[in-house]
């Protein structure tokens, strides 16, 4: 068995060494704590006894075979689903009973496996949608276009352009979101999530559909986001090269249960992980 591998269409292939993540102080209080989290659908345990801690500036990976429960975990964290049992702490604050909107205000933002932009709106307006959870004017002031409204709109424009410039997208501000190339749409969705000022950013298969060049750019951008904004990032991804290169901690799910946690090297050499992806091999097999 090779000491390092990535999973690629059911085969173990050599994985190049040289991860790009530096040693980091992950902070005293975790950004996220999941404690015995679970949810059942009609008696089926989609996620069972899920516990995980993510440091304040950690890039963490959540991996597993298709149907393992990864996106369900994201839906629990963002309150699309309310857990059947367990606790979620964001920066030490219990999110129990909170709505999708409330946990976003608390500091959890996400992107989706399938891009969900407002295609007929401009790039800038897509980003400003995320800024509206920070509105400081009333509906009355907005309807009458009072000075408070214009002050906020000016600040929102400046913030949107600042965020777009970080990803070299400011020149696209007036373009329709739906007209952008695929990779740029992915970046825009991440920028919009960042506009909500999150403490934890959840990325659901951010490299899906990307070519190798776009994936390499994405990897650099994820590290850039962590270093620029000082936030925690948790990602679901099937591109194991991406995961193994940038994630400090990796959690592996199978059939809704955690089967392994650890560093890239530990996960790559974990028998339970290999079996989950590739199936159990008889001792006599080569």
Residue ranges, per PLM feature:
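Glycine-rich phosphate-binding loops of nucleotide-dependent enzymes
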Residues: 2-286
């Amino acid at each position: 068995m090779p000491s390092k591998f990535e999973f690629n269409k059911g085969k173990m292939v050599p994985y190049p060494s040289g991860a790009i993540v530096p040693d980091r102080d992950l902070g005293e209080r975790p950004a996220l704590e999941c404690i015995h989290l679970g949810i059942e659908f009609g008696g089926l345990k989609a996620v069972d006894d899920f516990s995980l801690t993510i440091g304040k500036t950690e890039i963490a990976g959540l991996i597993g075979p298709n149907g393992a429960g990864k996106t369900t975990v994201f839906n629990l964290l963002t309150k699309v689903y309310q857990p059947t049992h367990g606790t979620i702490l964001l920066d030490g604050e219990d999110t129990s009973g909170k709505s999708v909107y409330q946990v976003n205000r608390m500091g959890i933002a996400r992107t989706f496996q399938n891009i969900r932009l407002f295609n007929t709106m401009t790039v800038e307006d897509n980003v400003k949608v995320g800024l509206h959870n920070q509105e400081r004017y009333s509906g009355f002031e907005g309807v009458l276009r009072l000075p408070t409204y214009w002050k906020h709109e000016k600040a929102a424009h400046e913030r949107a352009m600042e965020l777009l410039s970080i990803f070299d997208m400011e020149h696209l501000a007036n373009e329709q979101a739906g007209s952008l190339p695929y990779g740029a749409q992915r970046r825009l969705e991440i920028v919009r999530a960042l506009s909500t000022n999150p403490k934890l950013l959840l990325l659901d298969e951010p490299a899906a559909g990307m070519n190798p060049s776009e994936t390499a750019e994405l990897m650099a951008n994820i590290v850039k986001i962590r270093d620029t904004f000082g936030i925690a990032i948790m990602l679901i991804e099937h591109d194991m090269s991406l995961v193994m290169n940038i994630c400090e901690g990796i959690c592996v799910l199978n059939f809704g249960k955690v089967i392994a946690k650890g560093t890239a090297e530990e996960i790559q050499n974990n028998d339970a992980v290999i079996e989950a992806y590739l199936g159990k091999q008889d001792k006599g097999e080569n």
